């Protein structure tokens, strides 16, 4: 069974790649260079894909800085730092990129139909503190209907299925799953800041560090700055 994997190089997407392999899929990964602040993640995506031994890794290029609207695509919007986990859960954060997962899933759908894949794996996580609207179960259900209605395969009764194995998992549970699957955490990248070393203070770094700490595990990545989460 062929599967397209949305791979950012982060903790979640790397876990779903290894899950797809464990599910017996022939894996094709797709990453996106949308001129994001943290383009460093693309290097990690390549390394994770290479280590996993997938069939093909694609990088799609487009520029979401053309209209911005997010701290990840507009340098005039400050990146949140040193926020508590409770503070992260209050509102949809400025790191939300408008319609990003819809854009990503559209590319993944086209890729999947072109190679006659049966699945698209995405690492969305509704229980995380991000609050992103395009990481929630109702969104995935709606996009599944788009997959069914908007493709030849779907209209012929063989829709491409969206697989979101992390949707109801906590970050700690994702790490535990990744450990079981053999995910190389040292190759992954979560930081939003855009440096060569993970900052340790952006929301993404703090979520990751807090999860490793809760499990009593050491995150193998070096960090520029560490403070209790």
From Swiss-Prot:
Keywords: ATP-binding, Ligase, Metal-binding, Nucleotide-binding, Queuosine biosynthesis, Zinc
Ligand binding (Zn(2+)): 191, 199, 202, 205
Gene3D superfamilies: HUPs
Cofactor binding, per record: Binds 1 zinc ion per subunit.
Annotated GO MF terms: ATP binding; ligase activity, forming carbon-nitrogen bonds; zinc ion binding
Disulfide bond sites: none
Pathway(s): Purine metabolism; 7-cyano-7-deazaguanine biosynthesis
EC number: 6.3.4.20
Cofactor(s) the protein requires to work: Zn(2+)
BP GO annotations: queuosine biosynthetic process
Coiled coil: none
Positions of ATP binding: 7-17
Catalytic activity: 7-carboxy-7-deazaguanine + NH4(+) + ATP = 7-cyano-7-deazaguanine + ADP + phosphate + H2O + H(+)
Family: Belongs to the QueC family.
Function summary: Catalyzes the ATP-dependent conversion of 7-carboxy-7-deazaguanine (CDG) to 7-cyano-7-deazaguanine (preQ(0)).
Protein name listed in UniProt: 7-cyano-7-deazaguanine synthase
Native source organism of the sequence: Nostoc sp. (strain PCC 7120 / SAG 25.82 / UTEX 2576)
